[in-house]
Amino acid sequence: MIQGIQITKAANDELLNSIWLLDSEKNEARCVAAATGYEADQVIAISDLGEYESREVAIETAPRIEGGQHLNVNVLKRETLEDAVAHPEKYPQLTIRVSGYAVRFNSLTPEQQRDVIARTFTETL
């Protein structure tokens, strides 16, 4: 478990008011901020802090990224894409976003075009 602390009293004056992240599982302390004597991100053994008093500092953990979501935004009507499938000559410049890159709709295979239409226009999220 990781705990954030600010040292309020210590035998070592360089620790006074410094902020640390303590990892009890690894028995490590990571310096977040200190006036002198310690660098930001410096890692030491918790025992190297010596005797001290502290107050807890709330920390926010970054969200875990597990898989994730992807969003392509195309501002157009379903009818426009369906008409582009039926009459590609009318839409030579129709460009859409697919997986983060721009592509001309007419350069896609018919299967890819149907997939884009199905993914772009849904009834619910």
From Swiss-Prot:
Question: What does the record give under GO molecular function?
Answer: formate C-acetyltransferase activity
Q: Which HAMAP family match?
A: GrcA (MF_00806)
Q: Which InterPro entries match?
A: Auton_GlycylRad_Cofactor, Form_AcTrfase_GR_CS, Gly_radical, Glycyl_radical_cofactor_GrcA
Q: What does this protein do?
A: Acts as a radical domain for damaged PFL and possibly other radical proteins.
| Record protein name field | Autonomous glycyl radical cofactor
The residue ranges of the Glycine radical domain are 5-125
Q: Which gene encodes it?
A: grcA
Q: Which PROSITE patterns match?
A: GLY_RADICAL_1 (PS00850), GLY_RADICAL_2 (PS51149)
Q: Which UniProt keywords apply?
A: Organic radical
- Which cysteine pairs are covalently linked by disulfides here? none
Q: Does the keyword Metal-binding apply?
A: no
The terms describing its cellular component in GO are: cytosol
Give residue numbers for the modification (Glycine radical).
Answer: G100
